[in-house]
Amino acid sequence: MALTELRIASRRSQLAMVQTNWVKAELEKAHPGLKITVEAMATQGDKILDVALAKIGDKGLFTKELEAQMLVDRADIAVHSLKDLPTNLPEGLMLGCITEREDPADALVVNAKNQAYKLETLPEGSVVGTSSLRRLAQLRHHYPHLIFKDVRGNVITRLEKLDSGDYDCLILAAAGLGRLGFSDRIHQLIPGEISLHAVGQGALGIECVEGKPEVLEAIKVLEHTPTSQRCLAERAFLRELEGGCQVPIGVNTRFEGDQLILTGMVASLDGKRLIRDQTSGEASEAEAIGIALANTLKGQGAGEILKEIFETVRPEA
């Protein structure tokens, strides 16, 4: 049966709506005549802004409300920043499509008085804003002389806090800045040697209901196979480590010929212990590559580090 209507669930933040509207426009181009509607809503992660993300909890912080709409048949798909989508999805839902990835790097953004500095030259005591334990742990490892403070709110709110002097610089995803039209605020792209990016960073994931082949077929036009292979390896790595979106686990993937090379990292919260390794294999074996690297890092002590973190960063009741 031909699909005549498609209902999209989305977060209502500015970045989420930019991403969802891009998906909507691309699907309308691919399927002329298809009626597409969007329902935007706030998630738990959007509502709680006075508590560090890791203290709120990790399971579906930015996705659960969208998934609930699909499970009661009020939406057919949900558009996510793939880095926010847990690796284990609710029964009845599936990751139907992964779009072409934007630059997955982390970016340094500075205020007017710090334009002369790069990350590696920031003076001792400079205040760096980040809400990510992954960024925090890696930057503490390389730059223990800097001060790190949590920063919450949407991208525009964070930039306002930076420019008002609350912070000397921020670490944000380059892809999100670009999608919002703030590429000119990127002062420095942070190399992977310093900060491996989050699993799925820079890509969009379209989640859908299982058992609706016409919906899956409609959204597959946005699938980007190289990105999908890279992200499937990254997500398998994260899942095998039993990590989540709010733990210090970083990755990088790249192709060399038909080989997919995955680099992965686990760090302690204080940055003093950082385990990093890489593995490779055929791109068609993406999940196996991720699982293999996770087990390699476990053998080097990653499991003990993560256990300590889970015991330290418990969600607040």
Swiss-Prot record:
Cofactor(s) this protein cannot do without: dipyrromethane
Any Pfam family hit: Porphobil_deamC
EC number of the protein: 2.5.1.61
Record keywords, A-Z: Chlorophyll biosynthesis, Porphyrin biosynthesis, Transferase
Molecular function as annotated in GO: hydroxymethylbilane synthase activity
Top-tier EC class: transferase
Reactions the enzyme catalyzes: 4 porphobilinogen + H2O = hydroxymethylbilane + 4 NH4(+)
CDD domains: PBP2_HuPBGD_like (cd13645)
Cofactor: how and how many bound: Binds 1 dipyrromethane group covalently.
Coiled-coil residue windows: none
Modified residues (S-(dipyrrolylmethanemethyl)cysteine): C245
One GO CC term on file: cytoplasm
Pathways per UniProt: Porphyrin-containing compound metabolism; protoporphyrin-IX biosynthesis; coproporphyrinogen-III from 5-aminolevulinate: step 2/4; Porphyrin-containing compound metabolism; chlorophyll biosynthesis
GO biological process per UniProt: chlorophyll biosynthetic process; protoporphyrinogen IX biosynthetic process
Subunit structure: Monomer.
Other remarks in the entry: The porphobilinogen subunits are added to the dipyrromethane group.
Function: Tetrapolymerization of the monopyrrole PBG into the hydroxymethylbilane pre-uroporphyrinogen in several discrete steps.
Family named by the database record: Belongs to the HMBS family.
UniProt xrefs under PANTHER family: PORPHOBILINOGEN DEAMINASE
Name of this chain's protein: Porphobilinogen deaminase
